[in-house]
């Protein structure tokens, strides 16, 4: 059944019909389409298109249809309808006859599809928020469990300054907090109903759009029908948020892949989220993390795709907008799956504390402390930086750590240095000194963990 055949003399070419059909992917919107259709049927009662009895028959048939789909989800895909709207209308008519043909009065697929999409996106946002918050909780759990594990912090993948594993965890808590904020912000603009906009210029029926919007759980209704059916900003924003968050997940994965490598050996990943080699029996590969890292690309691709689809598109609805869905559906599923896997990885992670500390002791990550020490003794920072660099070069030549250099060597570079230098360049001292807000000092980390536990209601 086609919803638009009256004006045409010839049947659609079969190849074109398949090319034109969106049912193979927009069937995902079946619950939203039925939900919005029930709300629409109630509005049609208020304007005299339907009687109360007719509306109840339509609603009952739609609910029955939803239950049938629940029991046999393949039922939709076994048909050859153009889209989910035509599938629902055709099956409604099969159930209740001519009455089913009244439902589409005053409504266009143009406002229908964007309403369905907004309802679907709203539902998915709450699922994603739960997954992100759960991941944050796992970061906090791991941070609290390992708050005394000192490891190197890196710049340019070179050891830079000592940090703790807890501090690393808290960095990602902040990243994902921004992701939560973005989703909540998107929700404000998404939560506006376009239903009742018609094809592009509004509906000729005096529908109470405010009441209709609230009945579907929206906060308000849109103000311009032409914009309403054209608007896909909310998809751009949602795909942008997913791209940013997947970038965070990809960086998280890259960090752990390196930490898990034989060269670093900071962590051990659980057998449950790794795999082996078909040839090399010793291998334990971080497949879960590598897949998250790779899947980031497909999500970024979906964002680029929707931007390109919209960039030269005239108002209002154009068939190009059919291409707004597959990337969206895939991206949000990929994002949520990646969040769930990231939580699994964290839940089962084991730290090699000794390896972490040994790595922090190497690479002269305490060199900055010498510069700060000399500044406190009265030297300018630029000169102190130079002296510290010379001492690092000397330690490299002697194949020693800075802590192992004799006091006489320190003093040969600056008379300001006394034997208190040693207590100032221990790893613990490096951490304790960075007690400004946001610093790596253990007390600051404990405060931050408490604040985050309070925010996430896990005290």
UniProtKB/Swiss-Prot annotation:
Catalysis performed (reactions): 2-(N(omega)-L-arginino)succinate = fumarate + L-arginine
GO cellular component entries: cytosol
GO-annotated biological processes: arginine biosynthetic process via ornithine; L-arginine biosynthetic process
Localisation per UniProt entry: Cytoplasm
A single MF term (Gene Ontology): argininosuccinate lyase activity
Keywords assigned by UniProt, alphabetized: Amino-acid biosynthesis, Arginine biosynthesis, Cytoplasm, Lyase
Keyword Transcription regulation among record annotations: no
Enzyme class: lyase
Documented EC number(s): 4.3.2.1
CDD domains: Argininosuccinate_lyase
Domain of life: Bacteria
Listed pathway(s): Amino-acid biosynthesis; L-arginine biosynthesis; L-arginine from L-ornithine and carbamoyl phosphate: step 3/3
PANTHER family on file: ARGININOSUCCINATE LYASE
Recorded family membership: Belongs to the lyase 1 family. Argininosuccinate lyase subfamily.
UniProt-recorded name of the protein: Argininosuccinate lyase
Name of encoding gene: argH
């Amino acid at each position: 059944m086609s919803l638009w055949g009256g004006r045409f003399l010839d049947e659609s070419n079969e190849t074109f019909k398949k090319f034109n059909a969106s049912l193979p992917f927009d069937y995902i919107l079946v619950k939203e389409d039925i939900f919005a259709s029930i709300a629409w049927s109630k509005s049609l009662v208020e304007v005299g298109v339907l009687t109360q009895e007719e509306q109840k028959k339509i609603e009952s048939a739609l609910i029955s249809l939803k239950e049938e789909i629940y029991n046999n989800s393949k039922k939709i895909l076994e048909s050859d309808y153009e889209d989910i709207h035509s599938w629902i209308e055709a099956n409604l008519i099969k159930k209740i006859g001519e009455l089913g043909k009244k439902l589409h009065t005053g409504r266009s697929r143009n406002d229908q599809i964007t309403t369905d999409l907004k309802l679907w996106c709203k539902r998915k946002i709450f699922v994603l928020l739960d997954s992100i918050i759960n991941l944050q909780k796992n970061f906090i759990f791991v941070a609290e469990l390992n708050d005394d594990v000192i490891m190197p912090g890196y710049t340019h993948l070179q050891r830079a300054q000592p940090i703790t594993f807890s501090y690393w965890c808290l960095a990602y808590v902040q990243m994902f907090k921004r992701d939560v904020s973005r989703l909540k912000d998107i929700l404000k603009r998404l939560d506006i109903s376009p239903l009742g906009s018609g094809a592009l210029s509004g509906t000729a029926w005096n529908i109470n759009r405010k009441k209709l919007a609230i009945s579907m759980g929206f906060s308000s209704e849109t103000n311009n029908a032409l914009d309403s059916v054209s608007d896909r900003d909310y998809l751009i924003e949602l795909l942008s948020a997913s791209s940013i968050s997947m970038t965070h997940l990809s960086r998280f994965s890259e960090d752990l892949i390196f930490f898990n490598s034989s060269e670093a050996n900071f962590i051990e990943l659980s057998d449950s989220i790794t795999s082996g080699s078909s040839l090399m029996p010793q291998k334990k590969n971080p497949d879960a993390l590598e897949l998250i890292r790779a899947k980031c690309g497909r999500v970024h691709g979906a964002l680029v795709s929707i931007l390109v689809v919209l960039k030269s598109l005239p108002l209002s609805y154009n068939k190009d907008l059919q291409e707004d869905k597959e990337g969206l559906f895939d991206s949000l599923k990929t994002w949520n799956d990646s969040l769930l896997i990231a939580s699994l990885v964290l839940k089962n992670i084991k730290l090699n504390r000794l390896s972490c500390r040994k790595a922090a002791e190497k690479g002269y990550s305490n060199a900055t402390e010498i510069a700060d020490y000399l500044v406190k003794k009265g030297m300018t920072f630029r000169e102190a930086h130079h002296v510290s660099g010379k001492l690092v070069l000397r330690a490299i030549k002697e194949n020693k750590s800075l802590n192992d250099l004799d006091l006489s060597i320190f003093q040969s570079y600056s008379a300001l240095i006394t034997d208190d230098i040693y207590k100032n360049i221990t790893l613990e001292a490096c951490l304790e000194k960075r007690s400004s807000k946001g610093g790596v000092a253990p007390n600051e980390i404990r405060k931050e963990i408490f604040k985050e536990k309070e925010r996430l209601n896990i005290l």
